[in-house]
């Protein structure tokens, strides 16, 4: 059963950083282990780190300048010219460097095993095997300028957004490269980024208008403007499933916007219970909620991609068994109150 509660736009966070902090921000990638954000900067050629307090520091300088970012494990992979480079998210050490012979790699995503990257200028999509340090051309010609790309684990497809007037949205099979048109003409010009929110909806960032637009998972319902203000050429967006935020780099004014949405019951943010925590954390086997719950409480567990991996009801003082979860970061949502708790599984 897929958990699909109602969605409520809560607030526009004060996510605009000082202009000096960013220089051509292109891509934001949420790091769930560090609970922070990695931001590629095409102007300075740097990948920067923004923590939850708003402090911005440098992780590493990349040449050619970094565009799309994607994290697998402890490595952040960056589109850099005609290749992909991987850096330790701990200290910025270069750990992977593979050329695909591309022209201008722009967007990047992963299905957990392979990387998939768009070549904006050549109109191609490449599939990169990190373990084997090899690649193949998945799509030799998309017939346009592919930009943002995201792996859809529910539909088992690559969803790609395109540059240009009345831009299209297409899906591609990760094994054969076979294409399916999801939206032939969006009415949007220059779609830069795409991500998936906590409800399985697709969010796309366009330059004209400057907007974040939501599509339902089937792409059959009318598109919805999220109403995010202050955007200026929004680029390669991401969704922070732990904190429920759309992460938006504004390449036009050197800022990053965080727009928070309610992924659970529609309870206003200021009425949510923020006093509870998971103990112990990180954990390997059994955890408990502190302070104890007052009554039987339904819950769901979501992974960093927003996928439902567990659900049930917790009674007061009950222990939650997390032994079957794979190593990684998860969000435990108490659906009755909207409380979101971060869990790190060792």
Where are these regions (language model features)?
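Short, glycine-anchored, charge-dense loop/turn motifs used at functional sites
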Residues: 301-309, 330
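C-terminal tail/sorting-segment detector
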Residues: 311, 327-346
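Bacterial Sec-dependent N-terminal signal peptides
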Residues: 1-24
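Short loop/turn segments that connect beta-strands within beta-propeller blades
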Residues: 50-55, 88-93, 129-133, 173-177, ...
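Structural signal for beta-propeller blades
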Residues: 45-48, 84-85, 123-125, 166-169, ...
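Residue-level detector of functionally pivotal "anchor" positions at catalytic/ligand-binding pockets or at interdomain
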Residues: 261-279, 285, 307
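A short beta-strand motif characteristic of beta-propeller blades
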Residues: 21, 54-61, 93-99, 134-140, ...
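Beta-rich, blade/repeat-based domains predominating
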Residues: 22-34, 42, 62-74, 78-81, ...
């Amino acid at each position: 059963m897929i958990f699909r509660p109602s969605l409520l736009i809560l607030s526009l966070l004060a996510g605009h950083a000082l202009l000096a902090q960013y220089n051509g921000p292109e891509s934001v990638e949420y790091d769930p282990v560090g609970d922070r954000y990695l931001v590629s900067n095409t102007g300075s050629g740097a990948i920067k780190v923004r923590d939850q307090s708003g402090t911005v520091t440098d992780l590493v300088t990349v040449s050619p300048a970094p565009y799309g970012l994607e994290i697998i494990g402890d490595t952040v992979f960056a589109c850099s010219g005609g290749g992909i480079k991987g850096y330790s998210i701990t200290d910025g050490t270069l750990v992977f460097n593979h050329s695909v012979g591309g022209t201008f790699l722009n967007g990047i995503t992963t299905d957990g095993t392979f990387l998939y990257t768009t070549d904006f200028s050549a109109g191609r999509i490449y599939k990169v095997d990190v373990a084997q340090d090899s690649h193949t051309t998945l799509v030799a010609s998309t017939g346009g300028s592919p930009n943002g790309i995201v792996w859809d684990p529910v539909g088992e497809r690559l969803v790609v957004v395109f540059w240009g007037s009345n831009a299209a949205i297409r899906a591609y099979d990760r094994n054969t490269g076979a294409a399916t048109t999801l939206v032939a003409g969006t009415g949007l010009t220059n779609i830069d980024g795409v991500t998936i929110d906590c409800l399985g909806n697709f969010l796309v960032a366009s330059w004209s208008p400057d907007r974040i637009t939501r599509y339902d998972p089937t792409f059959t319902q009318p598109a919805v403007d999220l109403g995010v203000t202050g955007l200026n050429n929004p680029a390669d967006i991401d969704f922070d499933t732990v904190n429920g935020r759309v992460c938006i780099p504004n390449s036009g004014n050197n800022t990053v916007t965080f727009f928070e949405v309610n992924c659970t019951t529609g309870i206003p943010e200021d009425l949510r219970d923020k006093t509870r925590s998971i103990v112990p954390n990180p954990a390997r086997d059994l955890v408990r909620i502190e302070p104890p719950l007052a009554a039987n409480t339904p819950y769901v567990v979501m992974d960093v991609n927003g996928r439902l991996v567990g659900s049930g009801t917790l009674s007061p003082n009950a222990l939650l068994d997390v032994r079957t979860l794979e190593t990684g970061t998860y969000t435990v949502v108490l659906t009755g109150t909207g409380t979101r708790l971060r869990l790190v599984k060792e």
